[in-house]
Regions:
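Short N-terminal segments immediately surrounding and downstream of signal-peptide cleavage
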Residues: 21-38
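Long, low-complexity, compositionally biased polyampholytic IDRs enriched for Lys/Glu and Gln/Arg
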Residues: 247-277
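Short, internal strand/loop/helix patches
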Residues: 143-180
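N-terminal "domain-start" segment that seeds a small globular fold
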Residues: 47-84
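Bacterial Sec-dependent N-terminal signal peptides
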Residues: 1-25
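Thiol-/selenol-based redox modules, centered on thioredoxin-like
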Residues: 172-251
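Structural microenvironment flanking redox-active thiols in thiol-disulfide oxidoreductases
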Residues: 107-145, 156-163
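Short active-site neighborhood of thiol/selenol oxidoreductases, capturing the structured segment around
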Residues: 84-106, 110-112
C-alpha cells in the first residue's frame, strides 16, 4: 500500500503541472519510489561479488531516476550561529555527506581544499556531517575556511524524512551536485583507494574525482549563461562573436580537459575488461 502511494505521488507530480515549463519532482519522492528495488538488486550483486554490476545499478538509479529531481528543503546546523535552511544557499552546490568517523584518503582533503579555494566564488561547497558539533570541531581546522561545514542531529531534526533518505538510502560519504535551484545534476560516491597509496597519488586520485563534480557545476553555469544570451532576440555582431568564444578560465578549461582524459581512460578500461571477459569465456 505504501509503495502504491509513492507511485501515485510521482504520477501526480508528473501530471499536475501540465502545460508548465518543468515539473519539479522532489528527491525524496523519487528515491522512495525506486530505492527498495535498487537495494534488493544491489545487495544481491555485492553478495555475488559482482562489483561492476553493483556500480551499474547505482549509476542507473542516479541517472534514470534521481538526476533532474529537486532536493527537499531541510535544516542544517553550523558549528556556530543559527540553523540554516538548505534552500537559503544561493549558488550552485557541491554537497558532500560525511561523518567524522569516516577516514579520508591522505590526499582527499588537500585536493578538496584546493578546489574550494579556487571555485568558492562560483560554488557553495557544503560538507554535511551526521555527527555532533563536538566531533566536528575536532576536524574543522582540516577544511578550507571557504567550506561550509554543517551537522545534522537526527535526534532533534524535524526533517527526519529527507535526512533518512540522504543518510540511509544511498549511504555516505557521497557527493551531490545541484544547481542554484537545487536541481540535482549528478550524484557520485566518494572515491576510495588502498591505504598504501602515496600522498601524491592519493591527491591526484581525489583531485580528478572531485574535479568531475566541479566541472559539472561549471559547465551548467556556462550553459545557463549561453541560454540567457540566446533568449535575446537580436544580438549585436560583437555580442555574437563574444558568445562564440570560450568563456572558461584557464583553471576551468584544465579541469574539463582532465575530466575528458578521465572519461577516455574509463572507456579504455571498460574495453579491456570486456576483452578479458571474452577471452575467458573462450
Amino acid at each position: 500500500m505504501k509503495n502504491l502511494f509513492v507511485v501515485l505521488c510521482v504520477t501526480l507530480f508528473t501530471f499536475s503541472s501540465y502545460g508548465q515549463l518543468e515539473t519539479k519532482v522532489p528527491f525524496s519522492v523519487a528515491i522512495a519510489a525506486h530505492i527498495k528495488k535498487y537495494n534488493a538488486k544491489s545487495q544481491n550483486a555485492y553478495k555475488e561479488e559482482d562489483i561492476e554490476y553493483g556500480e551499474f545499478l547505482f549509476d542507473s538509479l542516479v541517472n534514470n531516476h534521481l538526476v533532474g529531481t529537486y532536493m527537499d528543503n531541510f535544516t542544517m546546523n553550523p558549528i556556530k550561529g543559527d540553523p540554516v535552511k538548505f534552500e537559503e544557499l544561493e549558488k550552485p552546490i557541491f554537497l558532500i555527506t560525511y561523518a567524522t568517523w569516516c577516514v579520508p584518503g591522505e590526499g582527499e582533503l588537500p585536493a578538496l581544499n584546493d578546489l574550494i579555494d579556487r571555485f568558492h566564488d562560483q560554488i557553495d561547497f557544503v560538507v554535511l556531517f551526521w555527527d555532533t558539533p563536538e566531533q566536528i570541531k575536532k576536524v574543522e581546522r582540516d577544511y578550507s575556511n571557504q567550506a561550509h561545514l554543517f551537522y545534522v542531529d537526527e535526534r532533534t531534526n524535524r526533517d527526519t524524512y529527507i535526512i533518512n533518505n540522504l543518510k540511509h538510502s544511498l549511504g555516505f560519504p557521497m557527493m551531490y551536485y545541484l544547481d542554484n535551484d537545487k536541481k540535482l545534476l549528478g550524484i557520485e560516491k566518494m572515491v576510495s583507494h588502498h591505504s598504501s597509496e602515496t600522498l601524491s597519488n592519493s591527491y591526484n586520485i581525489h583531485f580528478n574525482s572531485l574535479s568531475k563534480g566541479v566541472s559539472t557545476l561549471i559547465a551548467n553555469l556556462d550553459l545557463e549563461t549561453e541560454e540567457e544570451l540566446v533568449d535575446e532576440e537580436l544580438l549585436p555582431e560583437e555580442e555574437k562573436k563574444r558568445k562564440k568564444r570560450d568563456l572558461r578560465t584557464d583553471e576551468e578549461r584544465r579541469i574539463d580537459e582532465e575530466y575528458e582524459l578521465y572519461l577516455r581512460q574509463k572507456k579504455i578500461d571498460s574495453i579491456r575488461k570486456a576483452k578479458a571477459r571474452s577471452n575467458a569465456d573462450n
